[in-house]
Amino acid sequence: MAAVAAFAGWLLRLRAAGADGPWRRLCGAGLSRGFLQSASAYGAAAQRRQVAHFTFQPDPEPVEYGQTQKMNLFQAVTSALDNSLAKDPTAVIFGEDVAFGGVFRCTVGLRDKYGKDRVFNTPLCEQGIVGFGIGIAVTGATAIAEIQFADYIFPAFDQIVNEAAKYRYRSGDLFNCGSLTIRSPWGCVGHGALYHSQSPEAFFAHCPGIKVVVPRSPFQAKGLLLSCIEDKNPCIFFEPKILYRAAVEQVPVEPYNIPLSQAEVIQEGSDVTLVAWGTQVHVIREVAAMAQEKLGVSCEVIDLRTILPWDVDTVCKSVIKTGRLLVSHEAPLTGGFASEISSTVQEECFLNLEAPISRVCGYDTPFPHIFEPFYIPDKWKCYDALRKMINY
């Protein structure tokens, strides 16, 4: 009883700390005030710090898909889900709190529009959410499951790796759950700490039978998500949550598709190939501009977009041209997907390399809270690695 009383007292103290304290279960989820967070307890004299480590660079307005509308990334996701529910009467969306719109508001308004039988809440049980989605998909319906944070996808690991990914193979294609798509907010957010900032894509890159996708912008998010939902394989769609409100650009209102497993060369160059996905794409775009301005170095920038299966041909073709490769991601260095890219390029392009391949990634530590600015692979770390490659 003493332990229970002590725990209750601890909770009350946290609650008394207010909305900016650790009382919030969803630490780091409240983005409505933007990415400028107070240094908190120092009153009016408190300094404010900019935690966003990048500048979002919108793509040119698309003209081939009809009418466009200004959307941020979460609105683009909502638009894709709306299009899917309207087009496919079997499509259902489910997960923790999705009925009222979700933590990040990605499903707001969909329950009112399509009804509680098609957009509904589930218990807080990630293994159950994915298992339920597999069952729905096996019947031929379209299942769109939401895991509230990518950090909490691990309880569902067995269902994804041993069930969803292998269902078609173990039945000789008599049964499949290819109409399952799992959405999840992903990556650092500026103040998410240990359990709301992780980038677990590499865990699933070792799992044949599924596809893993990470967009960099609202336009990319809608097109790639629609492609995942319509794909014949189970897909995991990781959404960079720091971009939910920070990324704004023109997005087509009508549905459209962006091919999976096809990287995009955002900027052509001749001296160095820079590869990233998600938020980190905007970091390396800044690095490319710095390299051109300060060093006179021409960088080719590639957004990988699909982690599994990834576009080997586009990356290797670029490295054969430039002779140098830098890969960057937020996840820890050891065992990160940059290692797979580096290994493949080493095998395919060895005689073309002018310098060792460089990986600029997160540290091999749990994701820190107040030290997040030191943890993330920002433009200065990437620029330093690029300069060393050029001088090799």
Swiss-Prot record:
Places the protein is found: Mitochondrion matrix
Residues the record lists as binding thiamine diphosphate: Y152
Cofactor(s) this protein cannot do without: thiamine diphosphate
N6-acetyllysine PTM sites in chain numbering: K232, K241
Catalytic activity as recorded in UniProt: N(6)-[(R)-lipoyl]-L-lysyl-[protein] + 3-methyl-2-oxobutanoate + H(+) = N(6)-[(R)-S(8)-2-methylpropanoyldihydrolipoyl]-L-lysyl-[protein] + CO2
GO terms of molecular function: 3-methyl-2-oxobutanoate dehydrogenase (2-methylpropanoyl-transferring) activity; metal ion binding
Transit peptide: 1-50
UniProt EC number: 1.2.4.4
SMART domains registered for this protein in UniProt: Transket_pyr
Gene3D superfamilies referenced in this protein's UniProt entry, alphabetically: 3.40.50.920, 3.40.50.970
Chain sites annotated for binding K(+): G178, L180, T181, C228, D231, N233
Pfam family, one: Transketolase_C
Superkingdom as given in the UniProt entry: Eukaryota
Function: Together with BCKDHA forms the heterotetrameric E1 subunit of the mitochondrial branched-chain alpha-ketoacid dehydrogenase (BCKD) complex. The BCKD complex catalyzes the multi-step oxidative decarboxylation of alpha-ketoacids derived from the branched-chain amino-acids valine, leucine and isoleucine producing CO2 and acyl-CoA which is subsequently utilized to produce energy. The E1 subunit catalyzes the first step with the decarboxylation of the alpha-ketoacid forming an enzyme-product intermediate.
Protein name as it appears in the record: 2-oxoisovalerate dehydrogenase subunit beta, mitochondrial
Species annotation: Bos taurus
